[in-house]
UniProtKB/Swiss-Prot annotation:
It catalyses: S-ubiquitinyl-[E2 ubiquitin-conjugating enzyme]-L-cysteine + [acceptor protein]-L-lysine = [E2 ubiquitin-conjugating enzyme]-L-cysteine + N(6)-ubiquitinyl-[acceptor protein]-L-lysine. CDD domains: BIR, RING-HC_BIRC2_3_7. GO terms for molecular function: cysteine-type endopeptidase inhibitor activity; ubiquitin-protein transferase activity; zinc ion binding. The keyword ATP-binding does not apply. This is Baculoviral IAP repeat-containing protein 7. The record marks H52, V53 as: Cleavage. Disulfide bonds: none annotated. One of its GO terms (cellular component) is cytosol. It is found in: Nucleus; Cytoplasm; Golgi apparatus. The RING domain is essential for autoubiquitination. One of its GO terms (biological process) is apoptotic process. A zinc finger (RING-type) spans 239-273.
C-alpha cells in the first residue's frame, strides 16, 4: 500500500476510505489493488505540472502559528517531563520532517536527523523543539548530532530515554556536563535562545544564550495550564469551512488544513485564498 508520504510526493489526495485518490491539479482518478504478494498496482498515473517542490512538505499554518510566539511563561508550563508528549500532533516522524519545509539552507544540519531525534521546526530561523519534552535548540553547526544535543540539554525527556536508552544519556551527561545554571525569571525578554554548541565553562550568561529555557515545575506562579494549551490546539484543528469536522487534509503549498469532506470542493484555500496545487491526507493523533 502507498503511505501518506508517497501520495504527498505524488501530489495526490485521498477521496475517502476506499482505495481511490485524485491528482488535485490535473484531476485523473487513481485506484489501486493488491495482488497476492501485497504489492499495489496503479491503473492511471497523473501528471501534476506544479512547480512546487513536493519533496518539501507543508504543515498547518494554524498549528505552527500557535508554536511561534513562545514566551517564557509558556515554556515553564511543565509539559517537558510528563509521561505524555507535550505536542502529540508531532508524534509522527513524517509530520516532524514535514515541518522543515522552510528550513534555512544555511543551517549547519539537515532536517532528517533532527526529525528522527524528536525535533520539529518552529518556523523561525533554525529553532527546533522536541515534540515530547518541549525542549528547544537553535544555532546548529556542522557536525552537531541531534541525539547528543538532546541528551545534553534535556536528559529527562522520556522520548529520548526510550529511543536511546539511559546508558547513552548518562554517557553524554558524563562527558559533556552542563556547567552553571540561572533563574529563568531573571532572564531578559530578548535573550538569545538555544544552541547545541558546548557550553562555555561556568558562565551562566553564556549558558543563557545557548539553550531554550527549560520548562520548570508546573506549580511555579504564572505558569499556564498545559492542558488548556492543548485544548486550544485541538480547537484550532477544527475545519474552518464547515466548522464541524476535524481537519485531515493539508493543502500544498500554503499548509492550511480542512476536513476530508470539504477539500474536494475547493480550488482556492479558504483561509489564505492561495491556489491549491495539491492535497495530502494527514493522520493527526
Amino acid at each position: 500500500m502507498f503511505s501518506p508520504a508517497d501520495l504527498f510526493r505524488a501530489a495526490v489526495f485521498s477521496m475517502g476510505p476506499e482505495s481511490r485518490a485524485r491528482d488535485s491539479v490535473r484531476g485523473p482518478e487513481l485506484s489501486h489493488r493488491e495482488d497476492g504478494s501485497g504489492r499495489t498496482q496503479e491503473q492511471d498515473k497523473p501528471h501534476c505540472p506544479c512547480n512546487h517542490v513536493l519533496g518539501q512538505d507543508c504543515l498547518d499554518g494554524q498549528i505552527l502559528g500557535q508554536l511561534r510566539p513562545l514566551s517564557e511563561e509558556e515554556e515553564s508550563s511543565g509539559a517537558a517531563f510528563l509521561g505524555e508528549p507535550a505536542f502529540p500532533e508531532m508524534d509522527s516522524e513524517d509530520l516532524r520532517l514535514a515541518s522543515f519545509y522552510d528550513w534555512p539552507s544555511t543551517a549547519g544540519i539537515q532536517p532528517e536527523p533532527l526529525a528522527a531525534a524528536g525535533f520539529f521546526h518552529t518556523g523561525q530561523q533554525d529553532k527546533v523543539r522536541c515534540f515530547f519534552c518541549y525542549g528547544g535548540l537553535q544555532s546548529w553547526e556542522r557536525g552537531d548530532d541531534p541525539w547528543t544535543e538532546h541528551a545534553r540539554w534535556f536528559p529527562r525527556c522520556q522520548f529520548l530515554l526510550r529511543s536511546k536508552g539511559r546508558d547513552f544519556v548518562e554517557r553524554i551527561q558524563t562527558y559533556t556536563p552542563l556547567l552553571g545554571s540561572w533563574d529563568q525569571r531573571e532572564e531578559p525578554e530578548d535573550a538569545v535562545s538555544a544552541t547545541p554548541s558546548a557550553p562555555a565553562h561556568g558562565s551562566p550568561e553564556l549558558l543563557r544564550s545557548r539553550r531554550e529555557t527549560q520548562p520548570e515545575d508546573v506549580s511555579e506562579p504564572g505558569a499556564k495550564d498545559v492542558q488548556e494549551q492543548l485544548r486550544q490546539l485541538q480547537e484550532e484543528r477544527r475545519c474552518k469551512v464547515c466548522l464541524d469536522r476535524a481537519v485531515s487534509i493539508v493543502f500544498v503549498p500554503c499548509g492550511h488544513f480542512v476536513c476530508t469532506e470539504c477539500a474536494p470542493n475547493l480550488q482556492l484555500c479558504p483561509i489564505c485564498r492561495v491556489p491549491i496545487c495539491s492535497c495530502v491526507r494527514t493522520f493527526l493523533s
